[in-house]
């Protein structure tokens, strides 16, 4: 796999910091408690398109959170277990996802000038500079 020159997205910082890695993208919201296995970072929600896929060490790109207020607790446990995503990029800001981002202590951005769910694809290399609110996307080139 090789990558093409980067696309820049600009947004709003939720949690500062910098991270880069492979993107894991879903257009479906993620349920925290009961929707993920926080010890492995695997999505266990039966009908979710990423069922059985782990977000561990990925840049998680998703619309936002669904479910109970225990969402943040699930992501806190994932961080403690070493199974958390490296960074989060999301489109819908709620108190659940904001608190989840804070307890995760990983860079997080929202309110981007382009829709990250259409610009970023699973497997793209993504660099998140949440301090500046910048996301750089290096498109995966299929050879």
Label each PLM-derived region with a short phrase.
Residues 2-19, 24-136, 142:
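Feature captures the catalytic cores and cofactor-binding loops of soluble hydro-lyases/lyases
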């Amino acid at each position: 796999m090789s990558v093409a020159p980067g696309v820049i997205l600009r947004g709003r910082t939720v949690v500062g910091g910098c991270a880069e890695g492979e993107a894991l993208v879903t257009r479906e919201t993620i349920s925290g408690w009961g929707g993920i296995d926080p010890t492995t970072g695997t999505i266990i929600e039966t009908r979710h398109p990423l069922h059985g896929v782990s977000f561990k060490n990925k840049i998680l790109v998703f619309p936002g959170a669904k479910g109970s207020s225990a969402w943040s607790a699930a992501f806190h446990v994932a961080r403690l277990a070493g199974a958390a995503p490296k960074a989060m990029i999301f489109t819908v800001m709620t108190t659940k996802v904001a608190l989840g981002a804070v307890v995760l202590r990983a860079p997080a951005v929202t309110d981007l000038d382009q829709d990250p769910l259409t610009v970023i694809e699973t497997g793209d290399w993504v660099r998140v500079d949440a301090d500046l609110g910048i996301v750089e996307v290096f498109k995966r080139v299929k050879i």
